[in-house]
Protein backbone atom coordinates (compact mmCIF):
# COMPACT_ATOMS: atom_id res chain seq x y z
CA UNK A 1 0.00 0.00 0.00
CA UNK A 2 1.39 3.41 -1.01
CA UNK A 3 1.76 6.06 1.66
CA UNK A 4 1.57 9.84 1.28
CA UNK A 5 2.85 12.97 2.96
CA UNK A 6 6.53 12.01 2.85
CA UNK A 7 9.69 13.95 1.96
CA UNK A 8 13.19 12.63 2.48
CA UNK A 9 16.84 12.34 1.59
CA UNK A 10 19.41 9.86 2.84
CA UNK A 11 22.45 11.68 1.46
CA UNK A 12 23.49 14.52 3.77
CA UNK A 13 26.97 15.82 4.61
CA UNK A 14 28.09 18.09 7.45
CA UNK A 15 31.21 19.62 8.96
CA UNK A 16 32.14 16.12 10.11
CA UNK A 17 33.35 15.50 6.54
CA UNK A 18 33.26 17.93 3.59
CA UNK A 19 29.95 19.64 4.34
CA UNK A 20 29.73 23.37 5.00
CA UNK A 21 27.28 23.36 7.92
CA UNK A 22 26.86 21.48 11.16
CA UNK A 23 24.42 18.63 11.60
CA UNK A 24 22.06 20.73 13.71
CA UNK A 25 21.67 23.29 10.93
CA UNK A 26 21.15 20.63 8.28
CA UNK A 27 18.48 18.89 10.36
CA UNK A 28 16.68 22.14 11.09
CA UNK A 29 16.66 23.05 7.40
CA UNK A 30 15.27 19.65 6.43
CA UNK A 31 12.53 20.02 9.03
CA UNK A 32 11.67 23.47 7.67
CA UNK A 33 11.33 21.88 4.22
CA UNK A 34 8.76 19.43 5.64
CA UNK A 35 11.04 16.40 5.56
CA UNK A 36 9.73 13.36 7.35
CA UNK A 37 12.86 11.21 7.02
CA UNK A 38 16.48 12.36 6.89
CA UNK A 39 19.67 10.35 6.68
CA UNK A 40 23.14 11.65 7.50
CA UNK A 41 25.87 10.05 5.41
CA UNK A 42 29.35 11.33 6.26
CA UNK A 43 32.06 10.22 3.88
CA UNK A 44 33.33 7.11 5.63
CA UNK A 45 36.79 7.03 7.20
CA UNK A 46 39.36 5.47 4.86
CA UNK A 47 43.10 4.89 4.98
CA UNK A 48 43.89 7.59 2.40
CA UNK A 49 44.72 11.08 3.65
CA UNK A 50 41.86 13.31 2.53
CA UNK A 51 40.08 16.51 3.53
CA UNK A 52 36.72 15.01 2.65
CA UNK A 53 36.30 11.97 4.88
CA UNK A 54 35.22 11.64 8.48
CA UNK A 55 38.36 11.24 10.61
CA UNK A 56 38.36 8.14 12.77
CA UNK A 57 38.98 10.22 15.88
CA UNK A 58 35.70 12.07 15.26
CA UNK A 59 33.58 8.99 14.59
CA UNK A 60 32.19 8.79 18.13
CA UNK A 61 31.26 12.48 18.06
CA UNK A 62 29.51 11.99 14.74
CA UNK A 63 27.47 9.08 16.07
CA UNK A 64 26.52 11.01 19.20
CA UNK A 65 25.51 14.12 17.25
CA UNK A 66 23.25 12.25 14.84
CA UNK A 67 21.66 10.03 17.49
CA UNK A 68 20.98 13.13 19.62
CA UNK A 69 19.27 14.86 16.70
CA UNK A 70 17.20 11.73 16.09
CA UNK A 71 15.91 11.88 19.66
CA UNK A 72 15.17 15.59 19.30
CA UNK A 73 13.24 15.41 16.04
CA UNK A 74 11.30 12.15 16.30
CA UNK A 75 8.65 13.70 18.59
CA UNK A 76 8.34 16.51 16.03
CA UNK A 77 7.61 14.08 13.21
CA UNK A 78 10.96 13.72 11.46
CA UNK A 79 12.93 10.48 11.65
CA UNK A 80 16.72 10.83 11.48
CA UNK A 81 19.01 7.97 10.50
CA UNK A 82 22.73 7.40 11.02
CA UNK A 83 24.64 6.39 7.93
CA UNK A 84 27.91 6.59 6.06
CA UNK A 85 28.70 7.13 2.41
CA UNK A 86 31.17 4.31 2.07
CA UNK A 87 33.84 4.08 -0.57
CA UNK A 88 34.81 1.30 -2.93
CA UNK A 89 38.51 1.48 -3.78
CA UNK A 90 40.01 -1.96 -4.46
CA UNK A 91 42.73 -2.72 -1.95
CA UNK A 92 41.96 0.40 0.09
CA UNK A 93 38.29 0.71 1.09
CA UNK A 94 35.03 -1.23 0.83
CA UNK A 95 31.46 -0.68 2.05
CA UNK A 96 31.39 -3.72 4.32
CA UNK A 97 34.59 -2.86 6.18
CA UNK A 98 34.15 -4.43 9.65
CA UNK A 99 35.79 -1.35 11.17
CA UNK A 100 32.44 0.44 10.74
CA UNK A 101 30.49 -2.10 12.80
CA UNK A 102 31.00 -0.41 16.21
CA UNK A 103 29.19 2.66 14.86
CA UNK A 104 25.95 0.61 14.66
CA UNK A 105 24.87 2.32 11.46
CA UNK A 106 21.30 2.37 10.20
CA UNK A 107 22.39 2.21 6.57
CA UNK A 108 25.29 2.65 4.15
CA UNK A 109 25.55 4.26 0.75
CA UNK A 110 27.97 2.52 -1.61
CA UNK A 111 29.81 4.96 -3.86
CA UNK A 112 32.74 5.11 -6.25
CA UNK A 113 34.75 8.33 -6.40
CA UNK A 114 38.29 7.04 -7.02
CA UNK A 115 39.30 5.36 -10.27
CA UNK A 116 42.82 4.54 -9.15
CA UNK A 117 44.46 1.42 -7.77
CA UNK A 118 46.75 1.33 -4.70
CA UNK A 119 49.89 1.71 -6.82
CA UNK A 120 48.59 4.85 -8.56
CA UNK A 121 48.30 8.44 -7.32
CA UNK A 122 44.76 8.70 -5.93
CA UNK A 123 42.32 11.13 -7.51
CA UNK A 124 38.55 11.26 -7.84
CA UNK A 125 36.16 11.76 -10.74
CA UNK A 126 34.40 14.61 -8.92
CA UNK A 127 37.41 16.82 -8.26
CA UNK A 128 37.43 20.40 -9.47
CA UNK A 129 37.52 20.63 -13.26
CA UNK A 130 41.09 21.94 -13.40
CA UNK A 131 42.45 19.47 -10.87
CA UNK A 132 40.74 16.59 -12.62
CA UNK A 133 42.26 17.61 -15.96
CA UNK A 134 45.77 17.67 -14.52
CA UNK A 135 45.39 14.29 -12.86
CA UNK A 136 43.77 12.58 -15.84
CA UNK A 137 46.37 13.80 -18.32
CA UNK A 138 49.12 12.52 -16.05
CA UNK A 139 47.27 9.23 -15.43
CA UNK A 140 46.58 8.55 -19.12
CA UNK A 141 49.56 10.11 -20.93
CA UNK A 142 48.69 8.27 -24.14
CA UNK A 143 45.49 10.30 -24.40
CA UNK A 144 43.15 7.31 -24.25
CA UNK A 145 40.69 8.79 -21.79
CA UNK A 146 38.25 5.93 -22.19
CA UNK A 147 40.31 4.56 -19.33
CA UNK A 148 38.33 6.87 -17.02
CA UNK A 149 34.93 5.35 -17.64
CA UNK A 150 36.25 1.83 -18.10
CA UNK A 151 37.79 1.91 -14.64
CA UNK A 152 34.75 3.64 -13.12
CA UNK A 153 32.17 1.18 -14.43
CA UNK A 154 34.43 -1.71 -13.54
CA UNK A 155 34.61 -0.49 -9.94
CA UNK A 156 30.85 0.14 -9.78
CA UNK A 157 30.13 -3.40 -10.93
CA UNK A 158 32.71 -4.85 -8.54
CA UNK A 159 31.16 -2.89 -5.66
CA UNK A 160 27.67 -4.10 -6.51
CA UNK A 161 28.91 -7.67 -6.70
CA UNK A 162 30.71 -7.38 -3.35
CA UNK A 163 27.74 -5.76 -1.57
CA UNK A 164 27.69 -4.55 2.02
CA UNK A 165 25.60 -1.40 1.51
CA UNK A 166 21.96 -0.33 1.08
CA UNK A 167 21.88 2.42 -1.55
CA UNK A 168 23.98 2.88 -4.69
CA UNK A 169 25.19 6.48 -4.66
CA UNK A 170 25.27 8.83 -7.69
CA UNK A 171 25.34 5.99 -10.21
CA UNK A 172 27.17 7.80 -13.02
CA UNK A 173 29.29 10.31 -11.09
CA UNK A 174 31.97 9.68 -13.73
CA UNK A 175 30.16 12.13 -16.03
CA UNK A 176 30.60 15.14 -13.71
CA UNK A 177 33.71 16.57 -15.38
CA UNK A 178 32.91 15.25 -18.84
CA UNK A 179 31.33 18.52 -19.87
CA UNK A 180 30.46 18.62 -23.60
CA UNK A 181 32.14 15.22 -23.97
CA UNK A 182 35.58 16.60 -23.21
CA UNK A 183 37.05 13.28 -22.08
CA UNK A 184 34.85 10.57 -23.60
CA UNK A 185 31.67 9.94 -25.55
CA UNK A 186 28.77 9.03 -23.27
CA UNK A 187 26.72 7.92 -26.29
CA UNK A 188 29.38 5.45 -27.41
CA UNK A 189 28.02 1.90 -27.42
CA UNK A 190 30.88 0.60 -25.29
CA UNK A 191 30.13 3.23 -22.62
CA UNK A 192 26.40 2.52 -22.52
CA UNK A 193 27.03 -1.22 -22.49
CA UNK A 194 29.29 -0.84 -19.44
CA UNK A 195 26.69 1.31 -17.69
CA UNK A 196 23.89 -1.12 -18.50
CA UNK A 197 25.96 -4.03 -17.25
CA UNK A 198 26.17 -2.29 -13.87
CA UNK A 199 22.45 -1.52 -13.93
CA UNK A 200 21.55 -5.11 -14.73
CA UNK A 201 23.77 -6.38 -11.93
CA UNK A 202 22.15 -3.96 -9.49
CA UNK A 203 18.75 -5.25 -10.56
CA UNK A 204 19.88 -8.83 -10.06
CA UNK A 205 21.09 -7.97 -6.55
CA UNK A 206 17.90 -5.95 -5.83
CA UNK A 207 19.72 -2.81 -4.73
CA UNK A 208 18.06 0.56 -4.34
CA UNK A 209 19.66 3.35 -6.37
CA UNK A 210 19.38 7.04 -5.69
CA UNK A 211 18.52 9.82 -8.07
CA UNK A 212 21.04 12.32 -6.78
CA UNK A 213 20.40 16.05 -7.09
CA UNK A 214 24.06 16.91 -6.49
CA UNK A 215 24.51 16.90 -10.25
CA UNK A 216 22.14 19.86 -10.42
CA UNK A 217 23.38 21.70 -7.35
CA UNK A 218 27.14 21.28 -7.70
CA UNK A 219 27.94 20.52 -11.35
CA UNK A 220 27.95 22.41 -14.62
CA UNK A 221 26.00 19.48 -16.04
CA UNK A 222 22.79 20.78 -14.49
CA UNK A 223 21.23 17.32 -14.34
CA UNK A 224 20.95 14.66 -11.66
CA UNK A 225 22.83 11.40 -11.42
CA UNK A 226 22.12 9.14 -13.19
CA UNK A 227 21.38 10.32 -16.73
CA UNK A 228 17.94 9.71 -18.20
CA UNK A 229 19.07 6.81 -20.39
CA UNK A 230 20.39 5.00 -17.31
CA UNK A 231 17.24 5.78 -15.33
CA UNK A 232 15.16 4.32 -18.16
CA UNK A 233 17.21 1.13 -18.04
CA UNK A 234 16.77 1.02 -14.26
CA UNK A 235 13.02 1.41 -14.63
CA UNK A 236 12.86 -1.33 -17.25
CA UNK A 237 14.81 -3.66 -14.96
CA UNK A 238 12.62 -2.92 -11.95
CA UNK A 239 15.22 -1.13 -9.84
CA UNK A 240 13.72 0.81 -6.96
CA UNK A 241 14.94 4.39 -6.58
CA UNK A 242 15.13 6.81 -3.70
CA UNK A 243 16.12 10.47 -3.88
CA UNK A 244 19.21 12.05 -2.33
CA UNK A 245 20.13 15.72 -2.03
CA UNK A 246 23.82 14.96 -1.60
CA UNK A 247 23.53 18.12 0.46
CA UNK A 248 26.73 19.86 1.51
CA UNK A 249 25.03 23.13 2.51
CA UNK A 250 21.52 23.93 3.76
CA UNK A 251 20.73 25.47 0.35
CA UNK A 252 20.99 22.01 -1.25
CA UNK A 253 18.18 20.53 0.84
CA UNK A 254 14.97 19.87 -1.06
CA UNK A 255 15.45 22.65 -3.59
CA UNK A 256 16.41 20.49 -6.57
CA UNK A 257 14.21 17.51 -5.86
CA UNK A 258 11.22 18.60 -8.00
CA UNK A 259 13.42 18.82 -11.11
CA UNK A 260 14.98 15.43 -10.37
CA UNK A 261 11.55 13.89 -9.85
CA UNK A 262 10.37 15.29 -13.18
CA UNK A 263 13.32 13.54 -14.82
CA UNK A 264 12.48 10.31 -12.99
CA UNK A 265 8.96 10.57 -14.41
CA UNK A 266 10.42 11.04 -17.91
CA UNK A 267 12.21 7.74 -17.38
CA UNK A 268 8.95 6.01 -16.50
CA UNK A 269 9.05 6.10 -12.70
CA UNK A 270 5.92 6.86 -10.72
CA UNK A 271 7.17 6.14 -7.19
CA UNK A 272 10.14 6.55 -4.88
CA UNK A 273 11.26 4.44 -1.94
CA UNK A 274 12.22 5.71 1.49
CA UNK A 275 13.67 4.11 4.60
CA UNK A 276 11.13 4.00 7.42
CA UNK A 277 13.38 2.01 9.78
CA UNK A 278 16.78 0.35 9.33
CA UNK A 279 16.30 -2.23 6.59
CA UNK A 280 12.64 -1.32 6.09
CA UNK A 281 11.76 0.46 2.84
CA UNK A 282 8.36 1.82 1.82
CA UNK A 283 6.96 3.18 -1.43
CA UNK A 284 5.45 6.61 -2.06
CA UNK A 285 4.25 8.33 -5.22
CA UNK A 286 6.37 11.03 -6.82
CA UNK A 287 3.38 13.36 -6.82
CA UNK A 288 2.93 12.89 -3.09
CA UNK A 289 6.55 13.82 -2.39
CA UNK A 290 6.30 16.88 -4.62
CA UNK A 291 3.19 17.97 -2.71
CA UNK A 292 4.94 17.53 0.64
CA UNK A 293 7.82 19.77 -0.47
CA UNK A 294 5.55 22.62 -1.60
Regions found by a protein language model. Name each.
Residues 1-95, 100-102, 175-189, 229, ...:
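An N-terminally biased module of ancient metal coordination in phosphate/nucleic-acid-related enzymes
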Residues 11, 30, 108, 170, ...:
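Conserved, mostly hydrophobic/aromatic
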Residues 38-40, 108, 168, 209, ...:
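Hydrophobic residues within beta-strands of alpha/beta enzymes
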Residues 43, 113, 173-176, 214, ...:
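Flexible loop residues that form catalytic
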Residues 59-204, 289-294:
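Extended substrate/RNA-proximal surfaces in nucleic-acid metabolism proteins
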Residues 190-253:
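Active-site-adjacent C-terminal substructures of enzyme catalytic domains
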Residues 255-294:
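Mid-to-C-terminal alpha-helical segments outside catalytic/metal-binding sites
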Amino acid sequence: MLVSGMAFSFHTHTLFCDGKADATTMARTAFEHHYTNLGFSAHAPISLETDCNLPWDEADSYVYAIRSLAQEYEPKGMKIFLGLETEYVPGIAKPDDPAYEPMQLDYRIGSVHYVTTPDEYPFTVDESEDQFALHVQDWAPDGDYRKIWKRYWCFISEMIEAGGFDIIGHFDLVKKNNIAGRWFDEENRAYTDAAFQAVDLAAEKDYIAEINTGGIARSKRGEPYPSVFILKRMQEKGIRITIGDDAHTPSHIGVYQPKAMDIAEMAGYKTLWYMDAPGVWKEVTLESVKAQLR
